């Protein structure tokens, strides 16, 4: 009798555990946070331009206005070649201090291309509201618009070559020889070899695989392995490349 109850208890635990895993997987696959009830500011919202070409033209127009107001304004455009898009540039605008130079502000946007609309909006707001006569009397400003224009245009974080620009800038080539020893542990987990498919077995088992890996190696080392950036897996995430990106070479 005791053995029978033990078996029943064990089966009940297995069923409860299976249900818990099923619920966790379902919530993981269907998670969608509710949008907050915030009334957008129409004037501020107008600054956000989703498409790269439109944002670039808006930046150039603001540059025209500043060039008409201030002296010795310099402008440049660095073309960025692409096999998938055209008309890509890193645009620069330099407004020197108009009277007695004491400091220089450098502002860039779109290092992670998909963040470009927000960065462009903030840049143009800065141009409209902060680049006035008083501020520019002793302070110069250098603006760099869309460091990663391909990512901006294609709504991708990385460049066309999958390079994370935030981990690409280096004073010497030693950076590109950096060994991220922990990254191979997580590469197979976070970079599936098959096209994305929410119904695939590897997706359904992702949570269990992740929990097992955390239990084996610890959250800290795994987080460090991912966020540190890596230079050995060109198709992996946070890939820093093997040399300066062409637009950074031009800026250097």
Predicted regions located by residue number:
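Structured catalytic-domain cores with a bias toward divalent-metal coordination
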Residues: 2-252
